[in-house]
From Swiss-Prot:
Protein name, UniProt field: tRNA pseudouridine synthase D
SUPFAM superfamilies registered for this protein in UniProt: Pseudouridine synthase (SSF55120)
HAMAP family tied to this protein: TruD
Enzymatic class: isomerase
Boundaries of every TRUD domain copy: 158-305
Organism, scientific name: Vibrio campbellii (strain ATCC BAA-1116)
One Pfam match: TruD
Catalytic activity of the protein: uridine(13) in tRNA = pseudouridine(13) in tRNA
Family: Belongs to the pseudouridine synthase TruD family.
Length: 347
């Protein structure tokens, strides 16, 4: 994983095995699940694509050209990895109801396939998905037995719900820029950059808080003043309800949360506030950016438990299948299993 994550704690200790990740695009497959049906009519053409070795923005721009529209008229629910084989929907604003001839587009881009088209009355917006299904192959694993033991642990309790290195840009550039923007009070109309840098800022503070809970032995334990996520909303933890909430946590019915920092005060109290607040105070530049853009405080589960996790072993290769809710990172699961070996990619 990226060096920016190297300081963060592991649930079961730093992995002893190494492996190659994404040695081939087919070793990291992602299938998007929007979780809702289309209306079958409307101003927006929905195009389901499968791309290999391409990023979402590039495909969207090329699709816009093929449809004779501007790039801003093509949108998506989530960005997908470049070094992978991924399936997702893109929406194109074509209010006249036309369906373009994509034959030239497909001939020009053999790494892109169109799997289906449909119509909908709304465009796709970031976050308009329930999750993603993954097929991930770890190749040339140096200690298969250790990885399988770790997989059993992940299946039972999950992993730290860290934001992956993708959130912070190449070599952490997004985080560095977020700090600079906060320090220099930068103002911009570039919504994409502002969104990226704000996300990096909040994600980094969250990651540090989660790491601290691991280091302090309270990753799977409520402490006084925590904010629990329940089926009906959030609940402040104190002596009167801690035992009951801990029992519900053991059954997977409630979750422990950590801060996604905002310009308002943390809702945590007592011991939980003592744990979280220093990480906001230690990042004055990031907090200046967050407050300057009036981001409101939010919470995020500190544990990530993959759904339907299964795996097969073929020699020194391990192939995993699992599903994750939107906003979770498959790389955070891989990080708990192996140390990533450098791959010289030709794609």
């Amino acid at each position: 994983m990226s060096d920016i994550l190297s300081s963060l704690a592991y649930l079961t200790g730093k992995p002893v095995a190494s492996a190659k990740i994404k040695a081939q695009p087919e070793h990291f497959q992602v299938r998007e699940d929007l979780g809702f049906a289309f209306t079958g009519e409307g101003e927006h053409l929905l195009v389901r694509i499968r791309k290999t070795g391409e990023n979402t923005s590039f495909v969207a721009n090329e699709l816009a050209k093929a449809c004779g529209v501007k790039s801003k008229d093509v949108s998506w629910a989530g960005l997908k990895d470049r070094h992978a084989v991924t399936e997702q929907w893109l929406s194109v604003h074509l209010p006249k109801g036309e369906t373009p001839d994509f034959s030239a587009f497909l001939a020009q881009h053999p790494s892109i396939e169109i799997l289906a088209t449909d119509r909908h009355n709304k465009k796709l917006r970031p976050g308009d998905l329930v999750g993603n299904e993954f097929v991930v192959t770890l190749s040339e694993v140096t200690d298969v037995a250790d990885v399988e033991q770790r997989l059993e642990k992940v299946k039972q309790v999950g992993v730290p719900n860290y934001f992956g290195s993708q959130r912070f840009g190449n070599d952490g550039n997004n985080l560095e820029e977020a700090s600079r923007w906060g320090r220099e009070n930068v103002r911009t109309r570039n919504q994409n950059k502002r969104s990226m840098y704000l996300s990096a800022a909040r994600s980094w503070i969250f990651n540090r808080i989660v790491s601290a809970r691991l280091e302090n032995g309270v990753f799977d334990k409520f402490i006084d003043g925590d904010v629990a996520q329940t089926a009906s909303g959030t609940q402040l933890v104190d002596a009167s309800n801690m035992a009951a909430l801990q029992a519900q946590f053991a059954q997977g019915e409630v979750a422990i949360t950590a801060a996604l920092a905002g310009d308002n005060a943390l809702p945590t109290q007592a011991d939980a506030l003592t744990l979280e607040q220093p990480f906001l105070d230690e990042e004055p530049d990031l907090m200046a950016l967050i407050r300057g853009n009036r981001m409101r405080h939010d919470r995020r589960d500190i544990a990530l438990k993959p759904q339907d996790l299964a795996w097969t072993v073929d020699g020194n290769n391990i192939t995993m299948t699992f599903s994750l809710d939107a906003g979770s990172f498959a790389t955070s699961i891989v990080r708990e299993l192996v140390i990533e070996e450098k791959v010289e990619r030709e794609y």
